Swiss-Prot record:
Underlying gene: proS
EC number(s) stated in the UniProt entry for this protein: 6.1.1.15
Pfam families: HGTP_anticodon (PF03129), ProRS-C_1 (PF09180), tRNA-synt_2b (PF00587)
CDD domains: ProRS_core_arch_euk
UniProt catalytic activity: tRNA(Pro) + L-proline + ATP = L-prolyl-tRNA(Pro) + AMP + diphosphate
Name of the molecule in the record: Proline--tRNA ligase
Function: Catalyzes the attachment of proline to tRNA(Pro) in a two-step reaction: proline is first activated by ATP to form Pro-AMP and then transferred to the acceptor end of tRNA(Pro).
InterPro entries: aa-tRNA-synt_IIb (IPR002314), aa-tRNA-synth_II (IPR006195), aa-tRNA-synth_II/BPL/LPL (IPR045864), Anticodon-bd (IPR004154), Anticodon-bd_dom_sf (IPR036621), Pro-tRNA-ligase_IIa (IPR002316), Pro-tRNA-ligase_IIa_arc-type (IPR004499), Pro-tRNA_ligase_II_C (IPR016061)
SUPFAM superfamilies recorded: C-terminal domain of ProRS, Class II aaRS ABD-related, Class II aaRS and biotin synthetases
Quaternary organization: Homodimer.
Main subcellular location of this protein, as a coarse class: cytoplasm
Keywords: Aminoacyl-tRNA synthetase, ATP-binding, Cytoplasm, Ligase, Nucleotide-binding, Protein biosynthesis
Compartment(s) where it occurs, according to its Swiss-Prot or TrEMBL record: Cytoplasm
Length: 474
């Protein structure tokens, strides 16, 4: 058997959080850098994470009547100018195709930064009657935004996402859709990713370009910074009026449709890493992990060990994503590698344990080991996974709650902000929000539906109108 040292050491999280994060992404083989700056290669293990998110969300959206479609990567530049707020929001980072070969294109093509324009143009041609409504479309695709600063999964010039675009007859139906999707995203975090989200309405400054109302799901990373993990927008009739999307109602009256758009992206993978992982590498919740179980024979040349390992693999692979490692490498090397890759459950099978008809199981999230009867293992895995998932969620929730404070003075706000995490404060409006951003670097994450903390805004001394949750964010 080959003796190999583990060479993929991960930077300590406490010494350099940014380097630690990059190490985990690269050394757990989630991504690789490409030759084009700001564009990453999704390696099999990283892409499998995204596929598992896709499967979960697709299943939910199919039950709610949504249909998957695919729209083109590009659209003519002239369409970009139809919705003025939208173009102001996305023009700075929009990439365009201007030439083909040595010829200039007669009309520039915008590479989609998001697809409201494409969907609205299509809907304007196909919706005429109330019988055509609602339209509940979703697409899985890539988008391109020319970001200045990039970070794997969190911010890139190209990223993967799903974007839903729905059309409704009334404001009430569209708002119901907007909030329903927000609930779906929150449950995706809790039930698949073991991620607690703070959900709420965005301020006017932070809302989506072209939307009337934006809601978001916000996660708190281990370093105390927030991450916007998904959004759901009520677009009202803004795009409908710009693109003339009208329908005739049952009373033969012409009306503008009400639209929504919403999406989550590969940012969810970044959140998974930053919330759950540790100095040994990736830590993954069992339901989303590409490899849920790894079986490691401690003496693979021993017939009994090998046979037991293969039998157990045969049983478990019917219900789980399981891998049997028969590589000619030391058990210690294998342990380190699968800990680095965050595999939730490791099963160690050795001669000594088999004398008592036992195997050893190792849980990645808390490093707990225990012996268990071989015959009992398959029936106990569902409960093990449920316990692992719930404990990971509770740990993340505890971190969120312990790093959520409220301030009654601006100085108190600044002190809390330096400690990291969320800080709630009642403010007078956009003037206070922009001053806070300029002076502290904190941004408004969501508006809280709670009572005012103070009657006056600690920043402007004007009457407080709303309580907002602030944080420094990715």
């Amino acid at each position: 058997m080959k003796t190999m040292k583990r060479v993929k050491t991960v930077t300590a999280r406490s010494s350099d959080f940014g380097k630690w994060y990059t190490d985990v992404c690269l050394k757990a083989e989630l991504i690789a850098y490409s030759e084009a700056k700001g564009f990453i290669i999704y390696l099999p293990y990283g892409y499998a994470l995204w596929e598992n998110i896709q499967k979960h969300l697709n299943c939910t959206l199919q039950k709610t009547g949504h249909q998957n479609v695919y729209f083109p990567l590009v659209f003519p530049e002239k369409l970009f100018h139809k919705e003025k707020n939208h173009i102001q929001g996305f023009s700075p980072e929009a990439a365009m195709i201007t030439t083909t070969g040595k010829k200039n294109l007669s009309e520039k093509l915008v590479i989609r930064p998001t697809s409201e324009i494409l969907f609205s143009q299509y809907y304007s041609k196909t919706i005429t009657s109330y019988r055509d409504l609602p339209k509940l479309y979703n697409q899985w695709c890539n988008v391109v935004r020319w970001e200045k600063t990039t970070k794997p999964f969190l911010r890139g010039k190209e990223f993967l996402w799903q974007e839903g675009h729905t059309v409704h007859a009334t404001e009430q139906e569209a708002m119901q859709q907007t909030l329903s999707i927000l609930d779906i995203y929150q449950k995706l975090g809790k039930n698949l990713l073991a991620l607690p989200f703070v959900c709420g309405k965005k301020t006017e400054t932070e809302k989506f370009a072209g939307a009337l109302i934006t809601y978001s799901i916000e996660a708190l990373m281990h370093d105390g910074q927030a991450l916007q993990a998904g959004t759901s927008h009520y677009l009202g009739t803004n795009f409908a009026k710009s693109f003339q999307i009208q329908f005739q109602d049952c009373d033969h009256q012409k009306k503008y449709v009400h639209q929504t758009s919403w999406g989550v992206s590969t940012r969810l993978i970044g959140a998974l890493i930053m919330v759950h992982s540790d100095d040994e590498g990736l830590v993954l919740p069992p339901y989303v992990s590409p490899m849920q179980i790894v079986i490691i024979p401690l003496q693979p040349q021993d017939d009994a060990v090998k046979q037991t390992s293969e039998n157990l693999f045969s049983i478990l692979q019917k219900n789980y994503r399981v891998h049997l490692d028969l590589q000619d490498k030391t058990a210690g090397w294998k342990f380190s590698q699968y800990e680095l890759k965050g595999v939730p459950l490791r099963i160690e099978i050795g001669k000594r344990g088999l004398e008592n008809d036992e195997v050893t199981i190792f849980q990645r999230y808390n490093f707990a080991k225990q012996n268990i009867k071989t015959k009992d293992l398959p029936s106990q895995i569902p409960q093990l996974f449920e316990t692992i998932h719930n404990n990971m969620y509770q740990k993340a929730l505890q971190h969120l709650e312990q790093n959520r404070k409220q301030a009654t003075t601006y100085e108190e706000f600044k002190t809390y902000l330096k400690q990291g995490g969320y800080v709630a404060m009642s403010i007078s409006g956009t003037d206070a929000e922009l001053q806070i951003k300029q002076e502290t670097g904190a941004t408004a994450r969501v508006i809280l539906e709670t009572n005012l903390i103070t009657a006056n805004c600690p920043v402007t001394n004007k009457k407080a109108l709303q309580t907002v949750l602030f944080a420094r964010a990715y």
